[in-house]
Design a protein with these regions (language model features):
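A residue-level marker of the well-folded mature domains of exported/periplasmic proteins
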Residues: 1-188
Length: 188
């Protein structure tokens, strides 16, 4: 609606492609799925079951899940990708679904956490199961809890985003549009 009134719109962090926004500043979630798959492959030695924990239903997460699965199918013939475990982007839920996942699949080789809440729940669940270092953990977002998991050896890889620059770049873009005479058309 803002665009219909001539107000420029820029999205950041989570995109809304159908919004007619001028641009989006943020992570390419499909590429993030590739990076997490590659990290999971390396951490596990390319063998065993791989699990994904993240926010089911969000378009950006679904793109990451799809690319994770596609990367594994193309590059990891000795790995089985399990269905996604929904953590609802809540640390406590990530913990409970990971605990249930470990009980159901005690032979899981690697767990990949896709949202910022995933790792904070995955690591304690792996630790509590006595599987630190046995079950490999890879995750998204450079957060203090995730760094602690990496330092203690519960996690093996973190794929980082530069989230701290998304907002400033989006705001600078809007400022430039409003103060430099730059204009955009439907084709831009």
């Amino acid at each position: 609606e803002a665009m219909n009134q001539g107000i420029p719109v820029v999205t950041w962090d989570s995109d809304i492609p159908t919004s007619r926004r001028i641009t989006h500043v943020g992570t390419n979630w499909a590429q993030l799925g590739d990076k997490l798959a590659e990290a999971a492959f390396k951490a596990s030695g390319g063998k065993g079951k791989a699990a994904m924990v993240g926010l089911v239903g969000a378009s950006h997460m679904e793109a990451a899940f799809a690319n994770f699965r596609a990367w594994m199918e193309a590059n990891a013939p000795d790995m089985e990708v399990l269905p996604v475990f929904d953590d609802e982007a809540v640390v406590a839920k990530a913990h409970s679904v990971t605990a249930a996942l470990i009980q159901k699949h005690p032979d899981v080789a690697v767990i990949a956490g896709f949202d910022g809440s995933s790792g904070g729940g995955i690591c304690p669940a792996v630790r509590e199961a006595g599987k630190s270092g046995t079950i490999k953990v890879v995750m998204n977002d450079i957060l203090p809890a995730h760094m602690e998991c990496l330092k203690e050896g519960t996690a093996q890889y973190i794929v980082g985003q530069k989230r701290h620059i998304f907002g400033p770049i989006a705001l600078q873009t809007l400022y430039d549009i409003n103060h430099s005479g730059i204009s955009f058309t439907e084709r831009d």
